[in-house]
Every structure is written in structure tokens, then in C-alpha cells.
Amino acid sequence: MTLSDRLPLYGRLMRLDKPIGSLLLLWPTLWALWLAADGKPPLHVLVIFTIGTVLMRSAGCVINDYADRDFDGHVERTRNRPLATRAVSTREALALAAGLSALSFVLILPLDPLVIWLSFPALFLAASYPFTKRFFAIPQAYLGIAFGFGIPMGFAAVQGEVPPIAWVMLLANIFWAVAYDTEYAMVDRPDDLKIGIKTSAITFGRFDVAAVMLCYAVALGLLGWVGAQAGRGALYFAGLAVAAGMALYHYTLIRHRERAPCFKAFRHNNWLGAAVFAGLALDYLIG
């Protein structure tokens, strides 16, 4: 098989055909950049973080499939992934993940040295998350740290430091990630129970829907506190109100715990993150 034949396989391994993960990683990064820069992040920083988000999410997907290669064949949604079907070798996957990570590192070299230092725990979080499903009862919380680490890095890039408000925003992202990834885990719960991996959907059990809604409430409450501390105005809080309405819509989708509606709720979180960002950006622009 030629390289041109293999490129589509690598694209699938990187989830280039499924941008939802990159968007869920990008929105909190943009929240941080806008807040840190008072609504005017430097263009080069914005470009670097946007490209870096896609690269690191792609690297994380490759590592995830490497870690889960012996499980994915037993799960309906993942059984046709390239590593599960052996269409791509583990050696190829590791080389691809290393290359993507290296490109991400090169991207941030022009930024503040603190960003470079923070990139090391960010890489560790991205690489280790897939393995937490073997040990942690709620690996989605770990995912929230990994997916939200662009927040302290964004503040470091703009301000040269990471103020307390950035860590509160990261905490909000953790609760948001537990909410949306529990919806995702509800899709795979029957298969995950069979193969013995741990997810929040399994841990929460019959309280899964209530836990998801509580996490949404805490996440939005923390983002409200962040906005108040930063002196944001009505448009920011209008964005949070729209996001809250979307969370209530998710309740109507997940309350019966059916696979397709739960997956729809997960994917719809892109718009929830976008609503928060739109409120923040508009508040700086015309508020």
C-alpha cells in the first residue's frame, strides 16, 4: 500500500473527519485568550493556538486509539478504527503521534517561556488520559484537565503569568467535560461494561442524568463567577443564559438514555461552547 493510500487511514486515526473534538478543545482556549487579552488577542497567538489545538487533539486521538486498540474491536462504535482492524500498525501510530506533538511544540517556541514550560504537563495529560479509563472511576474529569490546559497556556501567552481566574476557568471546563463526555460514555455503556473499562456513565449509574445536569450547572456557575470577577457585562451573561438553555435541551435528549440522542447531545456541546464564546466576544466588542 502506497503512502497516498495510507493517508486517508492516518486522517481517520487523527479524526480529521470528526472535528467535534477539536472544537471542544478550542472553545475554552478561545475563552481564555479573549479574557486574558481584554477581547483583543494578538493575531499570531490566536493562529498558533488554533493550529496547535488541532494538532494536539489529533495526537491525542492517535494515542487514544493506540491505548484502546485491544478494546475498540469489541465496541460497536469503534470496531472499524484503523488500529482496531490492524489497517495501521502500532509503530506507524506512535510515529504519527510523536510527529504531531513535535509540530505542536515547534509552534509555541516563539511564545512566552512559561507557555513552553506548561506544554510539558499538557503533553503528559494528553498522552496519559487514554490509560486512565483502566484505573479512574471518572476519567472524564482527567479529560477536562487535558482539554482545558489551553486555558492556563493562553493566559501565559498573553499575560506572561497564570492568574487565579484562569484556574477557576479550568475548573469550569472540568465540570463541562464531565457533562459532555458522560453523555458520550452513555452511548458506549453496554459495551464498556462488557470489556471492563471505567467511565463516569458507569460510575454514576442511575444518577447519570442528574450528574450531567449538575455538572452543567456548576460549570456555568463558575463561568458566571469568572465573568463577574473580570467585570464582564450583560452580553457575556446572555451567552451563559443561552448555554444554560442548551444544557436543558440536552436533558430532553439524554433522559431516556438512548444511544442516538445521547450522542446528539454530546455533539451539540460544540454550540454550547460557541455560545459562551460569542457572549464573551460580543461583550468586549460592543458591550
Swiss-Prot record:
<dbReference type="InterPro" id="IPR000537">
    <property type="entry name" value="UbiA_prenyltransferase"/>
</dbReference>
<feature type="transmembrane region" description="Helical">
    <location>
        <begin position="160"/>
        <end position="180"/>
    </location>
</feature>
<dbReference type="GO" id="GO:0005886">
    <property type="term" value="C:plasma membrane"/>
</dbReference>
<keyword id="KW-1003">Cell membrane</keyword>
<dbReference type="Pfam" id="PF01040">
    <property type="entry name" value="UbiA"/>
</dbReference>
<keyword id="KW-0808">Transferase</keyword>
<dbReference type="InterPro" id="IPR039653">
    <property type="entry name" value="Prenyltransferase"/>
</dbReference>
<keyword id="KW-0460">Magnesium</keyword>
<comment type="pathway">
    <text>Cofactor biosynthesis; ubiquinone biosynthesis.</text>
</comment>
<keyword id="KW-0812">Transmembrane</keyword>
<keyword id="KW-0997">Cell inner membrane</keyword>
<dbReference type="GO" id="GO:0006744">
    <property type="term" value="P:ubiquinone biosynthetic process"/>
</dbReference>
<comment type="similarity">
    <text>Belongs to the UbiA prenyltransferase family.</text>
</comment>
<dbReference type="InterPro" id="IPR006370">
    <property type="entry name" value="HB_polyprenyltransferase-like"/>
</dbReference>
<feature type="transmembrane region" description="Helical">
    <location>
        <begin position="269"/>
        <end position="286"/>
    </location>
</feature>
<keyword id="KW-1133">Transmembrane helix</keyword>
<dbReference type="InterPro" id="IPR030470">
    <property type="entry name" value="UbiA_prenylTrfase_CS"/>
</dbReference>
<dbReference type="InterPro" id="IPR044878">
    <property type="entry name" value="UbiA_sf"/>
</dbReference>
<feature type="transmembrane region" description="Helical">
    <location>
        <begin position="19"/>
        <end position="39"/>
    </location>
</feature>
<keyword id="KW-0472">Membrane</keyword>
<feature type="transmembrane region" description="Helical">
    <location>
        <begin position="207"/>
        <end position="227"/>
    </location>
</feature>
<feature type="transmembrane region" description="Helical">
    <location>
        <begin position="43"/>
        <end position="63"/>
    </location>
</feature>
<feature type="transmembrane region" description="Helical">
    <location>
        <begin position="135"/>
        <end position="155"/>
    </location>
</feature>
<comment type="function">
    <text>Catalyzes the prenylation of para-hydroxybenzoate (PHB) with an all-trans polyprenyl group. Mediates the second step in the final reaction sequence of ubiquinone-8 (UQ-8) biosynthesis, which is the condensation of the polyisoprenoid side chain with PHB, generating the first membrane-bound Q intermediate 3-octaprenyl-4-hydroxybenzoate.</text>
</comment>
<protein>
    <recommendedName>
        <fullName>4-hydroxybenzoate octaprenyltransferase</fullName>
        <ecNumber>2.5.1.39</ecNumber>
    </recommendedName>
</protein>
<feature type="transmembrane region" description="Helical">
    <location>
        <begin position="234"/>
        <end position="254"/>
    </location>
</feature>
<keyword id="KW-0831">Ubiquinone biosynthesis</keyword>
<feature type="transmembrane region" description="Helical">
    <location>
        <begin position="94"/>
        <end position="116"/>
    </location>
</feature>
<dbReference type="GO" id="GO:0008412">
    <property type="term" value="F:4-hydroxybenzoate polyprenyltransferase activity"/>
</dbReference>
